[in-house]
């Protein structure tokens, strides 16, 4: 049984690990994976058709804990302990819930002190006792007790007339004064762990199409002095098609991983693929997982030729590998009486809306099957790749965008060289 410390408006954890409000989803999953022998039977709950309409939940079924992540920014918003019989809880080092101590109204009063009068929810038949960043829900035994809990008669804990021994049914940790109005806080400095995160990514474009990326980056920078004085650093960097490896490294720092392409599975869809001369060396990616961005370099010139932006929607094969990339892409409208106008495509745009702005692709989509090995199937199904305006949109079956690949302009003279090949 887990023995955890409750910190209102902040966290739930122990000496080895801590679930902190504002923590990105990937870090919470990393904690669960590291301690999989202790924390077992974890479920990932999400809406398959409408992933933005409901919170993303990690359900620790064995331990009676639910971690609720904001559907948009994917940071931890609420920590719910839904079954207090499966976990030990303490506050300021003193237990208020264990096998020997029941979490009664008297015990909560002793451990946390007085607070504002509670609120009775007749629909749930639950009584909610609220502290700042912390709420307890008590189960009422019958509807006949409801009049005792009307707010007009509640002037403090002593006047609530909770039946002796009534115990907590649920506990919530959140940011602010109201559970209903709470939002996921900004990522705490303790969660950066030396990484740089992207607050936003703007796609820069010229007259012909995408030209590069402008990234607004966040880092936990600490100047001279103690780590406790660390502050959030916000800065902007730009990278462009044609930039060298050294340019990108100086702008964004070292990638988390370098991946060399062993084959190009999309090559067959290019003009005259059988005429292309096989390369002796392979193109390679810089994978920036916390930025949600991949950068592809040409094997011969070592210059940027593609950017890949990842949305990290649940139900996609690459889910939880990348932090969500909050991108904005200006689109050139292909409509009557809309010459010169632009609209913006974001991480949350749906493919139907993008098609209305850009026009329907001339060619049918390429169906993309992903699996960990040739003999395995992908439980999430295939995705569909559409090409428009030097961009490839990978579309999931629920109409959301899984990734966007941006292509640089063709190199001068490349068509001539291709035509001269035997």
Curated annotation (Swiss-Prot):
Keywords, ordered alphabetically: Cytoplasm
Record-given protein name: Phagosome assembly factor 1
Gene name for this UniProt entry: PHAF1
InterPro entries listed in its UniProt record: PHAF1 (IPR005373), PHAF1/BROMI (IPR039156)
Record's function text: Plays a regulatory role in autophagic activity. In complex with BCAS3, associates with the autophagosome formation site during both non-selective and selective autophagy.
Family assignment from sequence similarity: Belongs to the PHAF1 family.
GO CC, alphabetical: dendrite; phagophore assembly site; synaptic vesicle membrane; trans-Golgi network
GO biological processes: Golgi to plasma membrane protein transport
A Pfam family the protein falls into: PHAF1
């Amino acid at each position: 049984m887990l023995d955890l410390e409750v910190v209102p408006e902040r966290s739930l954890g122990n000496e080895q690990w801590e679930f902190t409000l504002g923590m990105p989803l990937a870090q919470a999953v990393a904690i669960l994976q590291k301690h999989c022998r202790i924390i077992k039977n974890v479920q990932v709950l999400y809406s398959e058709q409408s992933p933005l309409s409901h919170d993303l939940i990690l359900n620790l079924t064995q331990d009676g804990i639910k971690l609720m992540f904001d559907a948009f920014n994917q940071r931890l918003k609420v920590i719910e302990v839904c079954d207090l019989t499966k976990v030990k809880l303490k506050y300021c080092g003193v237990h208020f819930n264990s096998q020997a101590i029941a979490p009664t109204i008297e015990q909560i009063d002793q451990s946390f002190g007085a607070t504002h009068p509670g609120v009775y929810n007749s629909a749930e038949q639950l009584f909610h006792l609220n502290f700042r960043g912390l709420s307890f829900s008590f189960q009422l035994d019958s509807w006949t007790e409801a009049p005792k809990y009307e707010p007009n008669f509640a002037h403090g804990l002593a006047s609530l007339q909770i039946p002796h021994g009534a115990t907590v049914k649920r506990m919530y940790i959140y940011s602010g004064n109201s559970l209903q109005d709470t939002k996921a806080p900004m990522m705490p400095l303790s969660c950066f762990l030396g990484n740089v995160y992207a607050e936003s990514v703007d796609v820069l474009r010229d007259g012909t199409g995408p030209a590069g990326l402008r990234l607004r980056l966040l880092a936990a920078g600490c100047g001279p002095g103690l780590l406790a004085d660390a502050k959030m650093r916000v800065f902007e960097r730009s990278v462009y098609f044609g930039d060298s490896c050294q340019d990108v490294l100086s702008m964004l720092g070292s990638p988390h991983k370098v991946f060399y392409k062993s084959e190009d599975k999309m090559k067959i869809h290019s003009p005259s693929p059988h005429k292309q001369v096989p390369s002796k060396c392979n193109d390679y990616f810089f994978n920036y997982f916390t930025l949600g961005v991949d950068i592809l370099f040409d094997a011969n010139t070592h210059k940027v030729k593609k950017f890949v932006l990842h949305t990290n929607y649940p139900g996609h094969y690459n889910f939880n590998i990348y932090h969500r990339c909050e991108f904005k892409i200006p689109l050139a409208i292909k409509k009557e009486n809309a010459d010169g106008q632009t609209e913006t495509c974001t991480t949350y745009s749906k493919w139907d809306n993008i098609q209305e702005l850009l026009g329907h692709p001339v060619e049918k989509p390429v169906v993309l099957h992903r699996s960990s090995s040739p003999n395995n199937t992908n439980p999430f199904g295939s995705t569909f790749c559409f090409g428009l305006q030097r961009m490839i949109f990978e579309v999931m079956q629920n109409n959301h965008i899984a990734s966007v690949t941006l292509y640089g302009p063709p190199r001068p003279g490349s068509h001539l060289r291709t035509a001269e090949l035997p």
